[in-house]
Curated annotation (Swiss-Prot):
Transmembrane segments: none
Protein name: Ligninase A
Keyword Iron included in the entry's annotation: yes
Signal peptide: none
UniProtKB keywords: Heme, Hydrogen peroxide, Iron, Lignin degradation, Metal-binding, Oxidoreductase, Peroxidase
One GO MF term attached to the UniProt entry: metal ion binding
One Gene Ontology biological process: lignin catabolic process
Recorded family membership: Belongs to the peroxidase family. Ligninase subfamily.
Role description: Depolymerization of lignin. Catalyzes the C(alpha)-C(beta) cleavage of the propyl side chains of lignin.
């Protein structure tokens, strides 16, 4: 998931 700031908020395991 990408937030409005363009940074990932979820990491794939």
């Amino acid at each position: 998931v990408t937030x409005p700031d363009g940074k990932n908020t979820a990491t794939n395991a």
